[in-house]
Amino acid sequence: MKQTWRWYGPNDPVTLSDVRQAGATGVVTALHHIPNGEIWSVDEIQKRKAIVEEAGLEWSVVESVPIHEDIKTHTGQYDLWIKNYQQTLRNLAQCGIYTVCYNFMPVLDWTRTDLEYVLPDGSKALRFDQIEFAAFELHILKRPGAEADYTAEEIAQAERRFATMSEEDKARLTRNIIAGLPGAEEGYTLDQFRQHLATYKDIDKAKLREHFAYFLKAIIPVADEVGVRMAVHPDDPPRPILGLPRIVSTIEDMQWMVETVNSMANGFTMCTGSYGVRADNDLVDMIKQFGPRIYFTHLRSTLREENPKTFHEAAHLHGDVDMYEVVKAIVEEEHRRKAEGSDDLIPMRPDHGHQMLDDLKKKTNPGYSAIGRLKGLAEVRGVELAIQRAFFSK
C-alpha cells in the first residue's frame, strides 16, 4: 500500500514536515478555500501541488472535490455545477493528479455527537451516541416525523438524556452535529439546517439514486477520458439519518453503482471505519468483490456499543474491524494487479486517530491529531510488512 496522510492545507496544525517524519510518502488534500461548485483552476492546483512537492511528498489523492447540494437535489444550477466538476477533473489530470475521493451524502458529511470521548487510558476518541443524536433530533431540532426513526425505548431514553443536559451540553451537541467536521465543506446554523433538510422532503432513496446516476453518467465519461479514477466514500454512519436517504452504505449499493455506470473510472474508497459500523457489512468480501475498483483506502476501526447504533472510534488494530484480514485482502489485490502487469499501489491513510499524549494539550482537528494517526499508521504498516513477508516474500 502507498502510505498517505490527510493534510488540510497551510492552516493544518500538522505540518508537511510532520507528515514526512510519520513515514508517509503521499498527501491527501483538497482546495478547501474554493467554494463548492466552483472550478479548481490549474493555477490553484499547481500552487498546492508545489507546496506538497517542496516538502518531499507527492499529492496522491484529492479528498474531496465536493459535490454541490443542487446536484444532489437536482435543482437550481445543477447542470452548471456538473460542468464545473467536469472541468475540475480535467484540470487535475492536466496537473498529474488522478485519484479523486468524493461522497454523495445529503446535507451533512460525516457525523459524530461527541468529539472528546474519553477512553479508559485517558486518550480521546470520536463517538456517535444514538440516544444523544435522538435527543438532538427530537428535542433541539424538533424534526417533524422524527419519532418514526426510533424505537419507543430510544425515544424514552432520549427524553431522559435531554432532561439532564445543561444549556452548554445542548449547544455543544448542536455544534458537533451541524457546524461541520474536518473535510466537510458545509456548516449550518440551526435554522439553516432545517431549511436544507426541507429541500429533501420529497427525495427518498430511489430519487436520490436517480440524481446520483445523473451525476455519474455525466462525470465518469470525463474521468475515463482523462485517466481520473473516481473513488466514492461511503456514508458515515452508513444508514439513513435525519430523515435523509443514504445510498453508499452497503455492498448492494456498490453493486448498484457498478451496474449504473460500468466503467473502471467508477470506483470506491474502502473506508473500513464507515462501512464497518454496520455488522452486516463484510469488509473482506467487499474488497474481494470490488478489489479492481478500489482506488483508495481509509483504515480505522470502530466499536459498536450496547445499542448497536452507538459506536466509538477504536484503536486501529482493535474494535469490530478485523484489520489483519482487511490489510491481507488489500495486499492480495495489489499482488493480483502486479501479476497482470500493473504496479498500481492502493493509497492508504490511517484515517482518524485518538487524541493522545502531547496532542491532548494542543488544538487539533477532531480525528486528525498527529500522534494518534502516527500510531495508527505505524501499526498498519507493521501488519502489512508481516503479511508481505509471510505470504509474498520470495
Curated annotation (Swiss-Prot):
It catalyses: D-mannonate = 2-dehydro-3-deoxy-D-gluconate + H2O. The keyword Manganese applies. It comes from Salmonella typhimurium (strain LT2 / SGSC1412 / ATCC 700720). It is an enzyme of class 4 (lyase). InterPro entries: Man_deHydtase, Xyl_isomerase-like_sf. GO terms for molecular function: ferrous iron binding; manganese ion binding; mannonate dehydratase activity. This is Mannonate dehydratase. Its cofactor is Fe(2+); Mn(2+). Catalyzes the dehydration of D-mannonate. SUPFAM superfamilies: Xylose isomerase-like (SSF51658). Its EC number is 4.2.1.8. Belongs to the mannonate dehydratase family. Pathway: Carbohydrate metabolism; pentose and glucuronate interconversion. GO terms for biological process: D-glucuronate catabolic process. It comes from the Bacteria. Disulfide bonds: none annotated. Keywords: Iron, Lyase, Manganese. It holds the Pfam family UxuA. HAMAP family: UxuA.
